[in-house]
Amino acid sequence: MIKSELVQTIANRNPHLFLRDVENIVNAIFDEITEALAQGNRVELRGFGAFSVKNRPARTGRNPRTGESVHVEEKWVPFFKTGKELRERLNADE
């Protein structure tokens, strides 16, 4: 599912809301999560999971084409840990 499909699904479930309003709400949620992560904060959605950032230290990598050693800078990467309820639902016997 892509973002536009998510917006459409939410709009279909809530016919009292305009599609544009649903799109604005979804964008606002993603913007807030992104901003919190950019500030180094953790975003927890109980039962669903938690978004956080982790540091990947600088390292020496290798160019796969030439075999030459390449310095890879340290960077921050997004990380998602699933919540217990989500894991249980995904692994439930149906």
From Swiss-Prot:
Family indicated by similarity: Belongs to the bacterial histone-like protein family.
Family matches, as Gene3D superfamilies: IHF-like DNA-binding proteins
Subunit and partners: Heterodimer of an alpha and a beta chain.
InterPro entries in alphabetical order: Hist_DNA-bd (IPR000119), Histone-like_DNA-bd_CS (IPR020816), IHF-like_DNA-bd_dom_sf (IPR010992), IHF_beta (IPR005685)
Pfam families: Bac_DNA_binding (PF00216)
Function: This protein is one of the two subunits of integration host factor, a specific DNA-binding protein that functions in genetic recombination as well as in transcriptional and translational control.
MF-aspect GO terms: DNA binding; structural constituent of chromatin
Superkingdom, natural source: Bacteria
Originating species: Chelativorans sp. (strain BNC1)
PROSITE patterns: HISTONE_LIKE
Protein name listed in UniProt: Integration host factor subunit beta
